[in-house]
From Swiss-Prot:
Assembly and binders: Tetramer of two alpha and two beta chains.
Enzyme class: lyase
The keyword Transferase appears for this protein: no
Its job: The alpha subunit is responsible for the aldol cleavage of indoleglycerol phosphate to indole and glyceraldehyde 3-phosphate.
Pathway where it operates: Amino-acid biosynthesis; L-tryptophan biosynthesis; L-tryptophan from chorismate: step 5/5
EC number: 4.2.1.20
Assigned keywords, A-Z: Amino-acid biosynthesis, Aromatic amino acid biosynthesis, Lyase, Tryptophan biosynthesis
Record CDD domains: Tryptophan_synthase_alpha
Cross-referenced NCBIfam families: trpA (TIGR00262)
A UniProt-annotated Pfam family: Trp_syntA
InterPro entries (UniProt xref): Aldolase_TIM, RibuloseP-bd_barrel, Trp_synthase_alpha_AS, Trp_synthase_suA
Protein name: Tryptophan synthase alpha chain
Molecular functions (GO terms): tryptophan synthase activity
């Protein structure tokens, strides 16, 4: 199978566009609506998906995404339900890259190889383990390679050159570039400049860098693309739309549609 990320970035480059990638937690606010939400993100123009599996202690997430985890868990969602939703999304959208963003404990609890295999079977393209830096990732990387899943690494803005070099050599799929250090979300807005990090990643021939953390407005997407990123990920801002419209499904889906269209439009050069 041709790598879906490679195909996506090549197609976007031809069209002079960047990627817009929304993040949501699978199962938020419940299993049935979660599928509709993810379906809406794709049909509204998302280029790829970054999805979380609910976890009781999401360390690196800001309050918005922590609350999404709690909502999903309280609705009774299980990892099996999450894989069911992923399988349905993959069946409906054969070409879109699907990435998971999660924590090591969740992977360990299921057994690394078993978990990666389940991800592959459900149509997942990449896994980013938020609390495992590149230099500690060997056991995950080896299995990712074995089952042909891209292992994604985070490049922090304060990373040393040797760390950036390592991320470039070990990562595949794309590189998750942090726009700042700390927890995710628009609680503290993204601060550029990341140009220096982008220059280094290009120099080391890293997988395409996508900027995340604190991306909530079209102009931030524009800035990211202008700075040389291949795209932008928006998590907290997407999840906030779910949170603000819990009791009004139609309004929620309408607002998500508008948000994705507006953010995607900002990737056009």
């Amino acid at each position: 199978m041709t790598n879906r990320y490679t195909t996506l970035f090549a197609n976007l480059e031809k069209r002079n566009e960047g990627a817009f990638i929304p993040f949501v937690t699978i199962g938020d606010p419940n299993k049935a609506l979660s599928f509709e939400i993810i379906d809406t993100l794709v049909s509204s123009g998302a280029d790829a998906l970054e999805l979380g599996i609910p976890f009781s202690d999401p360390l690196a997430d800001g309050p918005t995404i922590q609350e999404a985890n709690i909502r999903a868990l309280e609705s009774g969602i299980t990892p099996k339900d999450c894989f069911d939703i992923l399988t349905k999304i993959r069946a409906k959208y054969p070409h879109i890259p699907i990435g998971l963003l999660l924590y090591a404990n969740l992977v360990y609890a299921n057994g690394i190889e078993n978990f990666y295999q389940k991800c592959l079977d459900a149509g997942v393209d990449s896994i980013l383990i938020a609390d495992v830096p590149a230099h500690e990732s060997k056991e995950f990387r080896d299995i990712a390679k074995k089952v042909s899943i891209a292992q994604i690494f985070i490049a922090p803005p304060d990373a040393s050159e040797s760390t950036l070099k390592q991320i470039s050599e070990l990562g595949s799929g794309y590189t998750y570039l942090l726009s700042r250090v700390g927890v995710t979300g628009t609680e503290t807005a993204a601060n550029m400049p990341v140009e220096d990090v982008l220059t280094k990643l290009r120099e080391y021939n890293a997988p395409k860098p996508v900027l995340g953390f604190g991306i909530s407005k079209p102009e931030q997407v524009q800035q990211a693309i202008k700075a040389g990123a291949a795209g932008a990920i928006s998590g907290s801002a997407t999840v906030k739309i779910i949170q603000n419209n819990i009791s009004n499904k139609q309004k929620m889906l309408n607002e998500l549609t508008y948000f994705v269209k507006e953010m995607k439009a900002a990737t056009l050069n």
